[in-house]
């Protein structure tokens, strides 16, 4: 799937269309039976496209239960056009007292993708819950990203209607946690704005193009639920391959590895320069690696053994330099991912992850101080640190930026390291 190329070309065509209209276009609206009316005015006027007809979007709700589902087969796979069937079934078999997790995919995706299965399985493995996957593949199909962005509003309204129906059967909004990836994060936001008192929304690298810096009513925002947590993994400029947003949108916003590019994924700027030498699949894979890390981080975090501790700081550069270590109290620290609502830390939070799975681990600030000298001695080389556990496991970290780093006498060197989880109880250093 050529997702990045589709987004870039669709956005270019949208900008060209807007620039060709020197005068304001007439506002338009459309009403869909049983759903409501949509306009190209107000906070949504900038997109200038109305949502597609519901029959084209073909939204489906796939319902699972940790008690009743078997394998990958949903208990129900219901199109929005037959929503009453959900309520008939739910009245008999839906556990309204159990937490309900709702997964919403983004552009060029569907509920049949592996990541949705892995997230669903992880959620049902840690608690007795219901899981609903919102499949709007027909409205999120390539190549028209702008059309998909417009459709997100309608899908959000459809999702809100599903929840309102389940409320009548006893489901509490305080038991609902929506998890949206990319465009799906904004779908969740639109649904939350409609419902008013939703408990929680987790935005996984919310889509940036057409949403960043827009009116809070036209994107995911902290007002859409009592608790909104966001993981930013690809908040780079679209020209450089960025598909996510860097704008804070929640009560707590996590920026792993700075939030622009992720460890283990190729550098976006270098990639942009070399795009002309690479195949579409190579360019696509490099960019999407950063974007998709958001849902990988979240899925990993569902396991209680996989923690992503984060610290509030003014910038990632300050964080990486150790300026915000240690966390003086629990008010400034948080835990990225599934358990973010269990800790007090809010605001902009930074952390460093591993570059391969497991991505989660504790972070340690290492500082090397050299003894001062009356003589201005300078040497060149690299400094390595090896951690050794009591069962002889070890891992080595290079603390200098390069092999011939300038090492001045009396200077200090600081770096944050993230050891493998098996080395969390190391007993020796070399």
Q: Which positions does each model-derived feature cover?
A:
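Glycine-rich nucleophile elbow surrounding the catalytic serine of serine-hydrolase chemistry
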Residues: 105, 179-190
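Mature extracellular/periplasmic domains of secretome proteins
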Residues: 120, 191-195, 216-224
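The feature captures the conserved acid-bearing segment of alpha/beta-hydrolase catalytic domains
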Residues: 205-262
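Active-site loop->helix "elbow" adjoining a glycine-rich segment at hydrolase catalytic centers
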Residues: 155, 182-183, 206
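Non-catalytic cap/lid and distal C-terminal segments of serine-dependent acyl enzymes
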Residues: 151-152, 197
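Alpha/beta-hydrolase fold nucleophile elbow
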Residues: 170-182, 201
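Flexible, membrane-associating and regulatory peripheral segments of lipid-active enzymes
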Residues: 1-133, 140-143, 147, 151, ...
